[in-house]
Regions:
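Phosphate/nucleotide-binding beta-alpha loop and adjacent structural elements of enzyme active sites
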Residues: 1-41, 49-355
Length: 355
């Protein structure tokens, strides 16, 4: 019997799950995508290993071990560990499962696609030549493979393309090609709780200094406590952007905080070129979508210091080409690498290493 293609398999699963099946139907996860599925069909329940709730939307909440044999399950785990979630479902006896990305794709817009994937499909359709340009930039084959797999996932809702990736956040921003010497000056742009700065110090104990940028007061207080045992850390209570100004900020999103017109908190932002006068040697940026504007505000440092850079490009698909366009527009003597640190759409980092 001929094996169905990934899209045909998803279409068949979608038709059965939302048809007149006699099988019990569940979703793994309690979130906006689980709600979207529940709005389209009468589910038999939800599955969640991490809640104490026993009921949601009037339906029972089960643990994985309680899922009846013969059931159908859609996994709505979509961010850091969707592969792990699917593997757990695949281990269940006589349970047919499918990831939400594929089911949403097969629904032909009856279910909302994960925004990162929908945005990538739109951006690629508008600027295919930009993505081809980026693919040709990379300094090694691994970067090209990472790019191809991430794009296959984003463009075709094909989670199988991510089977080569694991959740490796502890390695993020630090790769064998990112070499450190005594006296390094590190800029932690989007420092959050201080974890990345601590990882930098582990790898470069003879550093010169750290410039730590975190705009939310409560988070900065926690970071200062976390980093109190370390020397020569300059805490900047601002976000990084291209100019000095005050903006609204959504502070309720944890490490995914982002600039927002309806944000609950006012924050101050400024350009790195305005805030730091000493030469810097390594810049890390994870600014929840503000990376291109922040790069515009550090062109002097890029030109004069020729620092290593590690820049998150996953927040907006246009950043895959906008970030290298900005940096290489200042000076083009960089090797460019790409690495990915989760099983899903988050945590893709582009590196710029001086030639």
């Amino acid at each position: 019997m001929k094996q169905l293609s990934q899209k045909a398999h998803a279409a068949a699963f979608h038709a059965e799950f939302f048809g007149n099946t006699t099988q019990k139907r569940f979703v793994l996860g309690i979130n906006e995508f689980a709600d979207a599925v529940a709005n389209r069909t009468n589910l038999d329940g939800f599955i969640d290993e991490y809640t104490t709730a026993t009921e949601y939307r009037g339906k029972p909440v089960l643990k994985l071990a309680q899922v009846p044999a013969g059931s159908m399950v859609i996994s709505t785990v979509t961010q850091a560990r969707p592969k792990t979630a699917m593997n757990k479902l695949l281990r269940l006896n006589d349970v047919v499962s499918m990831d939400y990305f594929a089911v949403a794709d097969a629904s032909h817009f009856q279910l909302p696609q994960v925004q990162a994937l929908a945005d990538t499909q739109k951006e690629y359709a508008s600027h295919p030549e930009k993505f081809e340009w980026v693919r040709d930039l990379f300094a090694d084959q691994e970067s090209r493979e990472v790019f191809n797999r991430v794009m296959e996932f984003r463009l075709n809702a094909n989670l199988r393309a991510m089977r080569f990736f694991d959740y490796t956040a502890d390695q993020q921003y630090f790769e064998p090609f990112v070499n450190f010497e005594p006296g390094e000056v590190f800029v932690d742009g989007g420092g959050f709780d201080g974890y990345t700065t601590e990882e930098f110090i582990k790898r470069c104990p003879q550093y010169g200094s750290v410039h730590f940028f975190e705009p939310t007061e409560t988070t900065l207080i926690k970071a200062k406590a976390q980093l109190s045992k370390h020397r020569d850390i300059h805490f900047h209570p601002v976000g990084l952007l291209d100019t000095e100004q005050t903006l609204s900020f959504d502070a309720d999103a944890g490490s995914a905080c982002k600039i927002s017109e309806t944000g609950s908190v006012q924050i101050n932002v400024d350009a790195l070129d305005n805030r730091v006068t000493e030469s810097v040697s390594f810049i890390k940026l994870d600014l929840e979508g503000a990376e291109p504007k922040a790069l515009e505000g550090m062109k002097w440092h890029i030109q004069e210091d020729h620092p290593k850079l590690a820049v998150a490009v996953y927040h907006d698909p246009a950043h895959f080409w906008q970030v290298p366009e900005i940096i290489l527009g200042v000076r083009n003597d960089y090797k460019v690498y790409l690495r990915h640190y989760t099983e899903g759409w988050t945590e893709t980092v582009m590196f710029f290493i001086p030639k």
